[in-house]
Each structure stands twice: as C-alpha cells, then as structure tokens.
Amino acid sequence: ETAVIAVIVGIVVIVFVRDFPEEKGGYPDNNPAFDGEKAKAEHQAALEYLKTSKWTALKCLKTGRMWVLWIAVGITGFMSMGIMSNFVTKFMVMGYELPTVLQMLGIAGVLAIPGSIVVGWLDVKIGTKKTGILINVLAFVAVLCCLTHVTVLHYISLPILAVMLGGSSNLMVSCTAAIWGRYDFKNAFSVIQPLNSVMTGVGITVVSACNSIDPTCQLAYIIMAVMAVIGLIAMCVLKVEPIDSEVR
C-alpha cells in the first residue's frame, strides 16, 4: 500500500508541481503585488544565472558554512530520531506501562503537526537564526527532562519533542534558502538534505549502540544532551545570511 501511495504522489508531483511559481502563472511568495512582467523578466534572468552558477554540489561540499549548517540543524534531526526510536524502551525502563508510553508517544506525534506550524510562525516573526537557537535550547531542555525521574518533566518534554519533530526539517529549508537564496537553493539543498538524512540515521544507530552498553538508556540521553549543546553552539556561529552577493 505504501508503495502505491508513493507512486501516486510521484505522478501528482511530476504532473502538477513546478520548481517556481512563475511557471504556473503565480507570484514569488504568492504576493500579487509583484509586477508580473518585471517578475517574469527577473525569473528568466535568474534561470540564465543558474546555468553558470558556481554553487555546484562539489562547491557546496567544500564550503565551511554548509558543514556548520549540517551540525546546527542536523543535530535536531539526530535527536528527534534518536529519541523516537528509543522512546518506548526508555520510559518502560523508567517504570511506565506500555499503554501509557504509547499514549505519550501519540501526544508527541499529534503535537508535531502544529509544532511545525509554530516553528514556521517563529521563523517569520523573530527570524531564522533566533528560531534555530530556540529549538536547540528546547532540545537540550527536553533531554534534561527525560534524564530525570520526575513524571511532570517527562510530560513537559512531549510538546518540546513535538516542536523538534515538526520543526527540524522546516529549519533546514529556511536556513538553506536564507544562505543560498531562492535559485541556488536547489543546488545547496540537494547536498544538505542527504547529509541531514545521514545525521538522522546516525542518531538511531548511536542510541541503539548506547542502549546495548547501558540498559537504563541514560547514557544515550547524556550523549544527546552533549549533542544539543554542540548544535546550539553551531547555530550561534552560523551566519544565516546570503553567502555572497551573487546568490539569488
């Protein structure tokens, strides 16, 4: 069934989705205040620019800011997948019954939907970098809550986890767009997204390895707390601004 759904979605995307709104008669950011002819001319000029853009995959991989971005935002994905893959085991070891743990997991999953919206709203209101810093701080707080044996703190960690789940992918898109612009975004994101997938996969692997060493699951959460601090430092260092004057 999943494969059938994936095929259907793929067909819909191929037929109806385009890279730019201008290709479907729309406006950048869905803003009709744009001068249509001017926007069209700028779009054509940008497409010509892309033909000679220096931001190839190799160039992106050689760029330090790409790797700082990977650490700053990728770690939230590392933690999200690490926590989710370990959630049931962790809380059952701490004395929770399986139905309660599944209920908690369901709460976090449901809240991830509005969590994504909240992250998008914060991105617009306070800026991408500040939002990224906030998410990394919250990630650290969530892990600390889970390191305790205080039930109230465990439940407090759930909406924070939801924001991490719903917002980490949003933040990667926002940061990439802010740094490489609207047109070079495609080249940069084609590099950073696979790297991000590696980070999330590593999160699951590291947590599993830690649990084989420490059945209480505390070691895994201590490591994730350290990772959260590293991610926070990277986000503070990351320049969320156009990487040069040429990107569009």
Regions found by a protein language model. Give the residues of each.
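Small-residue-rich transmembrane alpha-helices and their cytosolic helix-loop interfaces
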Residues: 105, 109, 136, 189-197
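A late C-terminal transmembrane helix in Major Facilitator Superfamily
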Residues: 180-214
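Extracytoplasmic gate region of multi-pass secondary transporters
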Residues: 58-119, 203
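Symmetry-related core transmembrane helices of the 12-TM Major Facilitator Superfamily/SLC fold
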Residues: 1-15, 219-237
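Interfacial helix-cap and linker-helix signal at transmembrane-aqueous boundaries
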Residues: 91-92, 122-123, 207-215
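C-terminal transmembrane helical hairpin of 12-TM major facilitator-type secondary transporters
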Residues: 106-112, 118-119, 123-175
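Flexible cytoplasmic inter-helical loops of multi-pass small-molecule transporters
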Residues: 19-53, 244-248
